[in-house]
Amino acid sequence: MTRRNDKSNPRLAELIRLLKQTSRENEVEIWSDIASRLEKSRKNYAEVNVSKINRYAQEGETLIVPGKVLGSGVVEAGVTVAALSFSDAAVSKITEAKGQCISIEQLLSQNPKGSRTRILR
């Protein structure tokens, strides 16, 4: 018998369901990819420092982090970052650089097609 992989966090379970539904409705693979990453064990979630965001992002770009954004390093580009959660230091550094920190749910409602977004892990 296999064990069901249900998430005990109701917000996360609803987010995964919403990501899969939006992926099917809009025929976009990016949301199903994010959902499959969030369905995995929590120890496999992405933990991205703002220095990595600074290294790979250009001004005005939208990035998705299927995990947590941490505050180590500096960010110079004003980017929009959507993630499952943010540390307090990461939020302050991104907003100081004229960027935005939004939840994955907000990005999903703003951009259901997932156009011009990149996954960072």
UniProtKB/Swiss-Prot annotation:
UniProt key word Ribonucleoprotein: yes
Gene Ontology MF, one: structural constituent of ribosome
Keywords attached to this entry: Ribonucleoprotein, Ribosomal protein
Coiled-coil blocks: none
Alphabetized Pfam families for the sequence: Ribosomal_L18 (PF17135)
GO CC, any one term: cytosolic large ribosomal subunit
Xref: InterPro entries: Ribosomal_eL18, Ribosomal_eL18_arc, Ribosomal_uL15/eL18, Ribosomal_uL15/eL18_sf
Transmembrane residue ranges: none
Gene3D superfamilies linked to this entry: 3.100.10.10
Biological process according to GO: translation
Family: Belongs to the eukaryotic ribosomal protein eL18 family.
PANTHER family the UniProt entry points to: 60S RIBOSOMAL PROTEIN L18, LARGE RIBOSOMAL SUBUNIT PROTEIN EL18
Protein name per the record: Large ribosomal subunit protein eL18
Source organism of the structure: Methanospirillum hungatei JF-1 (strain ATCC 27890 / DSM 864 / NBRC 100397 / JF-1)
Gene it is expressed from: rpl18e
